């Protein structure tokens, strides 16, 4: 189909309108003309922009998203349907476009209220087959302004203006356009198969050619028959009956699979499934892992306090070799001593009572070097008690020699 351009100053003579059945990444594309609206008999057709050259790669980017092309392939495969197609053909069709754990959901509203049907991978082939068994000779989907989103392991396609078009030849040639929202989830791999199919139907229209109305303009009975719908909410009676049957068939898939795998009788399959379901319900919940109590660290006494408590047993001859800073007692008598508290460790395993103290002293009035050189000033320190072992002077070398022979004689 060719249409001339009405834009002023445009040199384009004609261009082709692309059907939703044609590939979106063709070799030629119609130029975009602002203010020009194009319609076909089946409804508005999306205009496909031209491909653009990727900078630095040197090749043309294929038009559109991979999800759009998968819908085109699905429409093309449905066009190959004939009345000779059997269950194997429909199963191969479903295997090509749907995952093994795919779920298909159809929602619509009838006279008695809203309906929602969800079927699994095993029942999906029969759903598409029921559309053709209901009198349809052609089926395809038209997507307008679809939105694609990338996720961790799948790609979602959300189209708020989706039209499912079916053509019926009996009792009269009728084209049924079902409008609604289509949400698909494609697995992000090489096969790009559908994992989730959710079609929410809003409204439908049934179109009849004017030529047929003109032929039966003088027949009131025929006109009354043509005025009646051949579908309910865009679905034939064959499809509606199958969806109602799926309410029973879907829960029985486990029984059928067990019967096919283990060759058990239906009664035994039902007993086994009920017993396993009862076990899952009665099984006690897994106990949560008990949190081990955090080990509390005991505060270590500082070196100075240890020496002060057991100073009577220490050898006085080695006292001068030790640094006064390390053996200095933590006493409140020392002025201007700052003790810094250590914050809790990372992870929050220790509480406030488990915080340790840093045994670092900051005293600007005390110089450790002067204490070593001046023995008298060190011994007269107010931090030392009256009975401190540091006040007693070490024995001279001659006294120590005189004590050694006495000890040897006693042995």
UniProtKB/Swiss-Prot annotation:
Coiled coil: none annotated. Binds to the LIM domain of a wide variety of LIM domain-containing transcription factors. PROSITE patterns: LID (PS51957). It comes from Gallus gallus. It is found in: Nucleus. Disulfide bonds: none annotated. One of its GO terms (biological process) is neuron differentiation. This is LIM domain-binding protein 1. One of its GO terms (cellular component) is protein-containing complex. Residues 302-318 have a biased composition (Low complexity). Residues 336-375 form the LIM interaction domain (LID) domain. Pfam families: LID (PF17916), LIM_bind (PF01803). Forms homodimers and heterodimers. Keywords: Nucleus. Its main location: nucleus.
């Amino acid at each position: 189909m060719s249409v001339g351009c009405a834009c002023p100053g445009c040199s384009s003579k004609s261009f082709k309108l692309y059907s939703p059945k044609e590939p979106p990444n063709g070799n030629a594309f119609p130029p975009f003309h602002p203010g020009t609206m194009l319609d076909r008999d089946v409804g508005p057709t999306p205009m496909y922009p031209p491909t653009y050259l990727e900078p630095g790669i040197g090749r043309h980017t294929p038009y559109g998203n991979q999800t759009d092309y998968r819908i085109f392939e699905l429409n093309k495969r449905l066009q190959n349907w004939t009345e000779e197609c059997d269950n194997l053909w429909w199963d191969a069709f479903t295997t090509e476009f749907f995952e093994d754990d795919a779920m298909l959901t159809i929602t619509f509203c009838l006279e008695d209220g809203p309906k929602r049907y969800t079927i699994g991978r095993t029942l999906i082939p029969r759903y598409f087959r029921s559309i053709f068994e209901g009198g349809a000779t052609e089926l395809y989907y038209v997507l307008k302004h679809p939105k694609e989103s990338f996720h961790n392991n799948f790609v979602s396609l959300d189209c708020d203006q989706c039209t499912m078009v079916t053509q019926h030849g009996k009792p009269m040639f009728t084209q049924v356009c079902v409008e609604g929202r289509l949400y698909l989830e494609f697995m992000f791999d090489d096969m790009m198969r559908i994992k989730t199919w959710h079609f929410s139907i809003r409204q439908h229209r049934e179109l009849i050619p004017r030529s047929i109305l003109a032929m039966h303009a003088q027949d009131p009975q025929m006109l009354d028959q043509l005025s009646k719908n051949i579908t309910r909410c865009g679905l034939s009676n064959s499809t509606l009956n199958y969806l109602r049957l799926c309410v029973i068939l879907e829960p029985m898939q486990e029984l059928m699979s067990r019967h096919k795998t283990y060759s058990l009788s239906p009664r035994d399959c039902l007993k086994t499934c009920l017993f396993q379901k009862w076990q899952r319900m009665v099984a006690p919940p897994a106990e949560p892992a008990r949190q081990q109590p955090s080990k509390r660290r005991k505060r270590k006494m500082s070196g100075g306090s240890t020496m002060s408590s057991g100073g009577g047993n220490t050898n006085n001859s080695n006292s001068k070799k030790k640094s006064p800073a390390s053996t200095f007692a933590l006493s409140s008598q020392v002025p201007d001593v700052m003790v810094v508290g250590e914050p809790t460790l990372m992870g929050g395993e220790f509480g406030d009572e488990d915080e340790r103290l840093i045994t670092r002293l900051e005293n600007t009035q005390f110089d450790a070097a002067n204490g070593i050189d001046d023995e008298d000033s060190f011994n007269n320190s107010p931090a030392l008690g009256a009975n401190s072992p540091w006040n007693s002077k070490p024995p001279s070398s001659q006294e120590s020699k005189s004590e050694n022979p006495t000890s040897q004689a006693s042995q």
